[in-house]
Amino acid sequence: MQNKLGTVRAISGDDPALREGAIGLVRPDERAEAHVLFRALWVVTSALLLLAITAATCSVAWEYSTRRYVKGFSDAIVPSSSAPEEKVDAILHWMSNGPARLDHGPDGSIRDPTETLNYASLLKVCGTATNAFVNLADSAGLSSRRLLLLDSNRRTMHVVAEVLVDGRWIVVDPVFRTVLRDSAGRTVTRKDLTNRSVFLAATSGIPGYDPAYTYDRTEHVRMARLGGIGSFLRVAFGRLAPGWEDSVTASLVLERESLATMMGAVLLMMALVLLRIFLRWYGVRRLGVYPPEMGARLLRAWSAYFDSGAGV
């Protein structure tokens, strides 16, 4: 670089002016690249949000339809003015002596009450029989949840239900169509059934009951099949909502596919809305970019469509 005398002055690599100029030369390309990446991410997020809104709308309609369907069943089976124990007996009586149903249904892992209520084969499997019972009990105004009986390896060997009656979670076995009772005829809880004598008195009179189905190891929510992710989710949910495993809502979500789908779609939609809010803040504050609003784009597309139609 020449000074006023025409001599050449060497510029050090650490010269602040040189460093400033170099940054100024690179910054436009980096900013342009960041703008392109930001706009692409914005478009993808907006598209996913539209899909999530559509999924949430469809799942809400599905859950509403399922709820109406199960409510119709419970209204026809359970007298609304009955006591809680009478409602339980009415549901079990219907499961045993209800109208003829189709013999062969889907596999036993299904969790859709519109299916489990209509196939005799599904009402003979502990998982789907409990699914039908829990959904009918919920529609009849009872607080009910499923209970998993585990073996020594923590694997599920049987599924029953618990119903809140007079402040106690009494045990009901839907597949055997019975309310478990002790030798005096009193209803029993899960804790009561850990007593060997009470367990034998409650189950010895049930035809075909496997004595291995004990209540020594039980869970309401089984997440071990998810491996490490299941353990992480259990800990995370436990910190966010202590006692969530014992809640009626958690059990109902697991026993009704439409409700689980609806909650998943709504949570995804909320997460994408929050992501768009963050992206908009980042674009405006950090990049100086104002992303176009989805509503404004749709309005322009709508107007252009009608303008082209009017021109024709």
Where are the language model's segments positioned?
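N-terminal intrinsically disordered, acidic low-complexity segments at the extreme N-terminus
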Residues: Q2-L25
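Hydrophobic secretory-pathway targeting helix
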Residues: D29-W62
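Juxtamembrane/start-of-transmembrane alpha-helix segments at the extracytoplasmic/lumenal side
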Residues: A34-W42, S247-M269
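Selective detector of the "anchor" transmembrane alpha-helix that sits immediately C-terminal
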Residues: S46-A52, R256-Y282
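Secondary-structure boundary elements
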Residues: T54-K124
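Hydrophobic/aromatic-rich core segments of domains that either
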Residues: N131-A201
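Extracytoplasmic/lumenal ectodomains and periplasmic regions of secretory and membrane proteins
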Residues: F176-S247
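Juxtamembrane interface at the cytosolic side of transmembrane helices
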Residues: M270-A301
